[in-house]
């Protein structure tokens, strides 16, 4: 296991650049001693914990005043890392925060690795692995709903569910041990078999129910992957720009001007819509455009939602019919663009629920948002306030494996296998669930997860 004997680390916890405040954070047993060497003000070793203290940062070698600061002094164990923490609040700016950080390092601190503060919180038992991952999700959340899921996970909703199941599995394993220790008692074996069957079915149902939230959780966390498709020059890029309320894609009358896949985010009902403006799908001899077309086809296959744009002022072409065919099994909304011009498209060959729009005149764009809302939110019941959602790919994969192990136990019971032979699968389920919370996670995984954090967190 990773050692719990830590040195004192330091890092800048605010974004680099100009700002009102910059924060240099220290964590470890020597935090107060290091800060006291460079801080002129109250004796930090004597101040009350969790207080802000006015003073100046001074280079002890030269006597140079670096900045006027407020120093937050927080004593263990009631801190984020459960170690002594010092937070030096400086005036924002690259130079001053860097110089103060270098002073702290010179006086005995070590530059923190990415995510090392949160890693220490995990290793010191302040948070488990799901809660540590929730910290990153809060930082990366693009909407309030994504943030709410992350906050709920940070609060321990997923941890509590997993830990309760693990405890129940341990209780069940204890009963199996009784069967192994006292095989001469047939009534004990029958009781144990009945308990194991009942409990494993209960565990499987709970985890399967949790897995059903994965699609909704992924949407709330990552957004609805939305491919805007159509033959060249039907208004795909104009639609993207309209939804974004800014010009991101090149808009011209020349077919093939979008040569690659453009991705941008827009909020619909508090959920991120990841808009993908694809290159027009058509046959072309242009090598660069061909690459864009292939990427467009890939985006179409992977999209949660497809916006198919057709030109209402022109008859359906072979390319239009091809797009209608290849997208018919997707979650699709058909948009008839350029309705400000005389309509010549054959609507009898289209589904009835098309939306007529004019991107140029900004007509009926709101109806697209209404349709998306109906597809994903109102009809699907996307958000339940008190529900626990799976949104992390690592969690989903592990719970799928846990369900498979439980199914193996249930199948063995159906075949009449003795419960003691099924102990291995039940124990494996307990171990897999422990990987989710970090109780049984390998050191390499922990290191890899925390390396994804930013410096200072």
Swiss-Prot record:
Q: List the disulfide bonds.
A: none
Cofactor, how bound (note): Binds 1 potassium ion per subunit.
Task: Show the InterPro entries listed in the entry.
Answer: G_TrmE, GTP-bd, GTP-bd_TrmE_N, GTPase_MnmE, MnmE_dom2, MnmE_helical, P-loop_NTPase, Small_GTP-bd
Extract the PANTHER family matched here.
TRNA MODIFICATION GTPASE GTPBP3, TRNA MODIFICATION GTPASE GTPBP3, MITOCHONDRIAL
Its cofactor is: K(+)
Gene (name only): mnmE
In the UniProt record, does the keyword Endoplasmic reticulum occur? no
Q: Which Pfam families does the record associate with it?
A: MMR_HSR1 (PF01926), MnmE_helical (PF12631), TrmE_N (PF10396)
- Localization per record: Cytoplasm
Q: What is the lineage of its organism?
A: Bacteria, Bacillati, Bacillota, Bacilli, Lactobacillales
Q: What is this protein called?
A: tRNA modification GTPase MnmE
Q: Where is the TrmE-type G domain?
A: 223-377
Cite the entry's keywords alphabetically: Cytoplasm, GTP-binding, Hydrolase, Magnesium, Metal-binding, Nucleotide-binding, Potassium, tRNA processing
UniProt family annotation: Belongs to the TRAFAC class TrmE-Era-EngA-EngB-Septin-like GTPase superfamily. TrmE GTPase family.
- Gene Ontology CC terms: cytosol
Q: Which residues does the record give as Mg(2+) binding sites?
A: 237, 258
The answer to whether the entry has keyword Phosphoprotein is no
* GO BP annotation list: tRNA methylation; tRNA wobble uridine modification
Q: Where K(+) is bound, by residue? A: 233, 252, 254, 257
What HAMAP family does the annotation carry? GTPase_MnmE
Highest rank taxon of the organism: Bacteria
Q: Which organism is it from?
A: Streptococcus pneumoniae (strain Hungary19A-6)
